[in-house]
A protein has these predicted regions:
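Structural and coupling elements of P-loop NTPases
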Residues: 1-278
Length: 278
């Protein structure tokens, strides 16, 4: 039941096919109560909306969206959605709400390591933050990033401001799930990926030459479980080393180190199950 639109959604199959129906009579009282609570919450964050609520006893759908949007921006509203990505149930509704009500990338600001505020605007110097690294067949190492500011174009030269290393992005891809589409550019607020970077790994900022923009690193949880690992045979040691290198690149919470005292390769992670899955 969607108490914002006051509709009952029925999903016929596992392909996300949705049928919009009237709310059943036996559920209407509960739905109206929840909608009233939603209206009151939306009105809390704006004086004009509060006045309309007192005058009319209710708010329109657009006014509710406006109030919820203000609440999200102030940190007073944390929307929760029930959905299934596997069966594509509720995903479309989540996307609708995100587009119409949630914060636009253009409204966000990021703070650099120096404490400077960088707005997510196309006219600002270009900067990207790499939040994930993957190793994929036929592509090799793939770096996923968000364009934090400016306009990224194919062939653009960027630098890692922390090391001074230069990087040319020869290929840029827009990402939609597992699908990648080669594009000539991306602008502030968009997410994309590129391949085979030298100066850019997970948690690294690449920014316009001379801009000095470097964002704070993601703080990953410390490892809680350690175990020794070895190859089944001496011939497999090279393969094991390559596999461990790929795993640690994809998952920064996996740490691989060699203990001189124990003369063993030590693998650290969040728990036994975490290590087993890797």
């Amino acid at each position: 039941i969607d108490v914002l639109k006051m509709k009952y959604y029925h999903f016929k199959d596992d392909n996300g096919t949705r049928e919009d129906l009237d709310i059943p009579a036996n559920l209407m009282d509960e739905a109206e109560t929840l909608r009233q609570e939603l209206i009151e919450k939306a009105a809390e964050f704006d004086d004009t909306l509060m006045e309309r609520f007192f005058e009319n006893g209710s708010l329109t759908e657009d006014e509710i969206r406006e109030g919820l949007g203000i609440g999200i921006r102030q940190g007073g509203v944390l929307p929760v959605f029930c959905l299934s990505g596997k069966k594509d149930i509720g995903v479309k509704r989540l996307m609708e709400f995100t587009i119409k009500t949630a914060i636009s990338p253009a409204e966000t600001k990021s703070v650099t390591k120096d404490g400077n505020v960088v707005e997510c605007k196309v006219e600002n110097p270009t900067s990207i933050f790499i939040y994930k690294t993957d190793v994929e067949p036929h592509l090799g190492e793939v770096s996923y990033f968000k364009v934090m500011s400016g306009h990224l174009t194919e062939g653009m030269d960027l630098e890692n401001p922390e090391t001074g290393d230069k990087e040319r992005l020869s290929a840029i891809y827009a990402v939609a799930g597992a699908k990648k589409e080669k594009v000539t550019g991306l602008q502030a607020g968009e997410i994309g990926c590129t391949v085979k970077l030298r100066a850019g790994k997970t948690n690294v900022t690449l920014s316009q030459l001379g801009s000095g923009i470097a964002y704070e690193h993601i703080v990953f949880p410390a490892s809680k479980y350690r175990c020794a690992i070895k190859a089944e045979s001496q011939n497999d040691e090279t393969k094991l080393g390559e596999a461990l290198s790929k795993i640690s690149a994809q998952d920064p919470t996996i740490i691989v180190e060699y203990s001189k005292e124990l003369k063993q390769t030590i693998l650290s992670g969040q728990g036994e199950q975490h290590i087993n899955v890797c």
